[in-house]
Amino acid sequence: MKFFNEIIDEVLTIGNEISDQQVDRMTKAIQGANHIFLAGAGRSGLMIRAFANRLLHLGYSVSLVGEISSPHTKSGDLFLIGSGSGETTSLVNQAKIAKDNGVVIGLFTTNSSSTLGEIADQVVIIPTQSKQSKDEALQPMGSLFEQTSL
């Protein structure tokens, strides 16, 4: 149980370091969107899918990118991306296309100076290690990012 409490403390510590201003701006973007598209890859993709489900339960119009039932994007839509590195090629390509079509881009990441960080209109930096990072954390690879991003 001690290890479990240490992990919870680690998540709480990181959560307290996330910028309230960034979260407020992202919240306003979510509230103002006509439709919200969400995408992530790997474990970050699992977290973004869970977030999409929560937004749906809150009454927002949401779709997961790549699903057969996803509508076409239009101006006034929001594309939320979860990417620890901010460099996942498929997500970068999707973000560029969406941006070119007038879609607002929101990003949850550890790396605001990444390619996705440069493309995004709204960024929430989750100050954890990415899977490429050598920083020490109790949890392996990007686990802390994934848990905190949810």
Report each predicted region and the residues it spans.
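Generic N-terminal amphipathic, Lys/Arg-enriched alpha-helix
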Residues: 1-16
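Short, contiguous, pocket-lining structural segments
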Residues: 3, 22-25, 43, 55
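Glycine-rich phosphate-binding loops that contact phosphosugars or nucleotide phosphates
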Residues: 37-41, 46-149
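A short, well-structured juxtamembrane/interface segment
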Residues: 16-32
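Generic secondary-structure signature for well-ordered alpha-helical cores
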Residues: 13-20, 60, 128-129
